């Protein structure tokens, strides 16, 4: 479960970071 949660969070954070860099 933890791995799944970390993966999900990591994806979310990565998207946010990309969005920030994109702007």
UniProtKB/Swiss-Prot annotation:
Residues modified to Leucine amide: 21
Q: Indicate where this protein resides in the cell.
A: Secreted; Target cell membrane
User: What cellular component terms from Gene Ontology apply here?
Assistant: extracellular region; membrane; other organism cell membrane
Please give a single GO biological process term from the UniProt record. defense response to bacterium
Q: Which UniProt keywords apply?
A: Amidation, Antibiotic, Antimicrobial, Membrane, Secreted, Target cell membrane, Target membrane
Tissues showing expression: Expressed by the venom gland.
Q: What is its main location?
A: secreted
Q: Which family does it belong to?
A: Belongs to the cationic peptide 04 (cupiennin) family. 05 subfamily.
Protein task: Has strong antibacterial activity and biofilm inhibition effects against Gram-positive and -negative bacteria including E.coli, S.epidermidis, and A.baumannii and oxacillin-resistant S.aureus and meropenem-resistant P.aeruginosa. Is not cytotoxic against human foreskin fibroblast Hs27 or hemolytic against mammalian red blood cells. Its mechanism of action involves binding to lipoteichoic acid and lipopolysaccharide of Gram-positive and Gram-negative bacterial membranes, respectively, to destroy the bacterial membrane.
Instruction: Write the protein's name.
Output: Lycosin-II
Phylogenetic lineage: Eukaryota, Metazoa, Ecdysozoa, Arthropoda, Chelicerata
């Amino acid at each position: 479960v933890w791995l799944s949660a970390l993966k999900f969070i990591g994806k979310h954070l990565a998207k946010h970071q990309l969005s920030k860099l994109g702007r």
